[in-house]
């Protein structure tokens, strides 16, 4: 059971160092001048932008998008935007510039979806754009989620994006109503990544307990940007390195198709079984492995494309590293909330399931006297359940009679005598 405790181990670069040698060269090259602690965080922050660059590639039996949803949190002024998110910003700027160039060439008449959009976008405008995204993954970005979301009481009317973010992660259909000249119902199947930054309070104010319960938070990798005391020079990329990056992104944008490799699936299942075995009887912990296992697949296939469909072993190593971070992140940040939700759900399940009712009815029969009346059954149910009326009591008595557990020894005569029943000894 020792392995179980590793689920809650720290996320820092000493515990879970960035795999420089196994990571795709594009990622390693963009983060190599940063301190180790920020190489780890900036590599993770790059995933959404690179998923957009590989936006035509899908994976698995259901052709899911290589979407990643990352929320970076750290102290105000600690360098989240300047360091952890800087490589991602460079990729985003190239993708956006290419978008602008394409529009300029057709004099702005193309109704396509921008590759990178701000978190401040309204749900209506986002839906309109996503209708034109085709089979491409796009992303939302904000370097300060508190200004994008709005007030502390849940965000403004334009930022109720949880449902679209959740659907966009898996590329499943999302239906919404909005009104222009006439009423219109739009159905979209978004492929949506995002990168958001903020202080811990701002990030977890948006991805709150409600978001945990509805599933939005489960898909997010929360990346902790650590405080670094030593001075670090601002990230700068040479003209040559930017040109090489532009060429690489151009290649990635030309890629399409669906990836589904047995070697990847075998590695993911082996990792998943290992983690599940360490959970014992903890059902919540076992369920929380599922999304990191899916992230394992996504990160592996993304790395495989970045490696030009070579070095599959390194791609699997990198995917496992991302999955390990995602799992530890989930266990440290949302496990306790999930456990509380399970307690509530357990109570609902246990009082609505056939198994519960069967067990309860057996206890009731054992507690009743050897000879009892219909009213005795009603009184017992009132004392031990949230009683909702007498309609269930006749059915319970009928089942007991049919199964040979009781017999009727006196018929009811209205306003004269009650029906009486007697237990039958087994």
Predicted ranges, named:
Residues 1-426:
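Phosphate-handling catalytic cores of nucleic-acid transaction enzymes
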